Amino acid sequence: MRLSYIFVVVATIITNCDIASASLRAIMSDTASGNGLGTRILRQTNDSDDLEPIRHAMLDMELLEKIAKDPKYAEEVFGNWRHNGQTKAEMENRLQSNGLLGKYRFIIDRYAEHLANSE
């Protein structure tokens, strides 16, 4: 018995949780039927929902690093937040949900000062 066949059988059993679907006939019929399942299985996955919170946290962290380093950029971003109606509490909640509030609390305080000065 070929080692590659053993890997295919084990992977099929793990994927389907069904020993009957691991027979050579079942594996070959799925591949030979022309549905392209064997070559397109990765294209059918939708990982954007799983990785979306991580991407948002990374974008927030990059943005906050730029704000911390560049005061002119900070004023521009604060102006955008104010223009879009973001309150201090909403920004605190956003950073809290991403786990960034502890590290970047000073930026929220600077945003509160910006809001007070712009009114």
From Swiss-Prot:
Question: Which UniProt keywords are listed?
Answer: Glycoprotein, Host cytoplasm, Host nucleus, Secreted, Signal, Virulence
Q: Which Pfam families match?
A: RXLR
Name the InterPro entries for this protein.
RXLR
Q: Give the induction text.
A: Expression is up-regulated in spores.
Q: Name one GO cellular component term.
A: host cell cytoplasm
Q: Does the keyword Secreted apply?
A: yes
UniProt motif (RxLR-dEER) ranges: 40-77
Subcellular location, record wording: Secreted; Host cytoplasm; Host nucleus
Q: Where is the signal peptide?
A: 1-22
Chain positions carrying an annotated carbohydrate: 46
Where is it mainly found?
Answer: secreted
- What information about domains appears in the record's comments? The RxLR-dEER motif acts to carry the protein into the host cell cytoplasm through binding to cell surface phosphatidylinositol-3-phosphate.
As for family, the record states: Belongs to the RxLR effector family.
Q: What does this protein do?
A: Secreted effector that suppresses pattern-triggered immunity (PTI) in plant host.
Its recorded name reads Secreted RxLR effector protein RXLR-C04
